Curated annotation (Swiss-Prot):
Role, per record: Binds to 23S rRNA. Forms part of two intersubunit bridges in the 70S ribosome.
Gene: rplN
Subunit description: Part of the 50S ribosomal subunit. Forms a cluster with proteins L3 and L19. In the 70S ribosome, L14 and L19 interact and together make contacts with the 16S rRNA in bridges B5 and B8.
Family statement drawn from the similarity comment of this UniProt entry: Belongs to the universal ribosomal protein uL14 family.
A Gene Ontology term for the protein's cellular component: cytosolic large ribosomal subunit
Any GO BP: translation
UniProt keywords, alphabetically: Ribonucleoprotein, Ribosomal protein, RNA-binding, rRNA-binding
GO MF annotation list: large ribosomal subunit rRNA binding; structural constituent of ribosome
PROSITE patterns xrefs: RIBOSOMAL_L14
Domain of life assignment: Bacteria
Protein name: Large ribosomal subunit protein uL14
């Protein structure tokens, strides 16, 4: 459950480490795995592709809140994380760190192909 003003980890190598959610593009008050949000970079690494304070789009790949699957199993992660994307939905980085939950079919296949582990 990601809301406005939520501080999130970045799960790719685009150069950002922490981002702040400043808007939701799903028309609801909260976002979950697979939703696209608008973020502002707060903590960056030197020589990265992104700049501090700039606004980007991101897709949520991990949430702390437990997500129930259709078979009854529950998936819960230890952090809220996003992957920065461009306007076409392609990731800005070339690697995705950590496990991610399976994203909606066909929407973010490039992000899922870069992930090491998809749950």
């Amino acid at each position: 459950m990601i809301q406005k003003n939520t501080l999130l980890d970045v799960a790719d190598n685009s150069g950002a480490r922490k981002v702040l959610c400043i808007g939701l593009l799903n028309g609801k008050k909260s976002a979950s795995v697979g939703d696209v949000i608008v973020v502002s970079t707060k903590v960056i690494t030197p020589r990265g592709k992104v700049s501090k304070g700039k606004v980007y789009k991101a897709v949520v790949v991990r949430v702390k809140k437990a997500v129930r699957r259709l078979d009854g199993s529950i998936i819960r992660f230890s952090s809220n994380a996003v992957v920065l994307i461009n306007d076409q939905g392609d990731p800005l980085g070339t690697r995705v760190f950590g496990p991610i939950k399976k994203l909606p079919f066909g929407l973010f296949s490039k992000v899922m192909s870069l992930a090491v582990e998809v749950l």
